[in-house]
């Protein structure tokens, strides 16, 4: 049973790394405002941007959120709705108020 849990964790980690890699590669496509590692200049180290809701409001979230099951659930919803090859940044398909409530509980 412990082996299955560990394998599942590794699969989740690989999926999350793939999502972040796709998002960070957007700087190459979009041009300015990015450093040499293709990361947005206004995003502190250890964080990444996500876009939430119909208006695609931008939020900067810590990488530590990736370990929380609630946030992982949002990422899975994003994958189901947009896939990994989405040129509009990491978009979370949920209401902004729901996102704000969830992230305030995680912090």
From Swiss-Prot:
Which residues form each disulfide bond in the chain? none
- What InterPro entries does UniProt report for this protein, alphabetically? SAUR_fam (IPR003676)
Q: Name one GO cellular component term.
A: plasma membrane
The entry's note on the tissues where this protein occurs is: Expressed in cotyledons, leaves, flowers and siliques.
Protein keywords: Auxin signaling pathway, Cell membrane, Developmental protein, Growth regulation, Membrane
What membrane topology does the annotation report for this chain? Peripheral membrane protein
- Where's it found, cell-wise? Cell membrane
Q: Could you provide one GO biological process annotation from this protein's UniProt record?
A: auxin-activated signaling pathway
Q: What is an example of a Pfam family matching this protein?
A: Auxin_inducible
Induction remark: Up-regulated by brassinosteroids and gibberellins. Up-regulated by auxin. Up-regulated by phototropism and gravitropism in the region of the hypocotyl farthest form the incident stimulation. Transcriptionally regulated by ARF7. Down-regulated by abscisic acid and methyl jasmonate. Induced by zeatin.
Q: What is its main location?
A: membrane
Asked whether the UniProt record includes Membrane among its keywords, one would answer yes
Keyword Cytoplasm attributed: no
Report which residue ranges the record marks as coiled coil. Answer: none
Q: How does it assemble?
A: Interacts with BZR1.
Q: Tell me the function of this protein.
A: Provide a mechanistic link between auxin and plasma membrane H(+)-ATPases (PM H(+)-ATPases, e.g. AHA1 and AHA2), and triggers PM H(+)-ATPases activity by promoting phosphorylation of their C-terminal autoinhibitory domain as a result of PP2C-D subfamily of type 2C phosphatases inhibition, thus leading to the acidification of the apoplast and the facilitation of solutes and water uptake to drive cell expansion. Triggers plant growth probably by promoting cell elongation. Regulates branch angles and bending. Effector of hormonal and environmental signals in plant growth.
So what family is this one in? Belongs to the ARG7 family.
Q: Which PANTHER family match?
A: SAUR-LIKE AUXIN-RESPONSIVE PROTEIN FAMILY-RELATED (PTHR31929)
Instruction: Please give the name of this protein.
Output: Auxin-responsive protein SAUR50
Gene this chain is encoded by: SAUR50
């Amino acid at each position: 049973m412990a082996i299955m849990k560990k394998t599942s964790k590794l699969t989740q980690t690989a999926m999350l790394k793939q999502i972040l890699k796709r998002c960070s590669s957007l700087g190459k496509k979009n041009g300015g405002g990015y450093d040499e590692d293709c990361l947005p200049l206004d995003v502190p180290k250890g964080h990444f941007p996500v876009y939430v809701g119909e208006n695609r409001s931008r939020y900067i979230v810590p990488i530590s959120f990736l370990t929380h099951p609630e946030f992982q659930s949002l990422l899975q919803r994003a994958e189901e709705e947009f896939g990994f090859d989405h040129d509009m940044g990491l978009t979370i398909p949920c209401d902004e108020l729901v996102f704000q409530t969830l992230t305030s509980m995680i912090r």
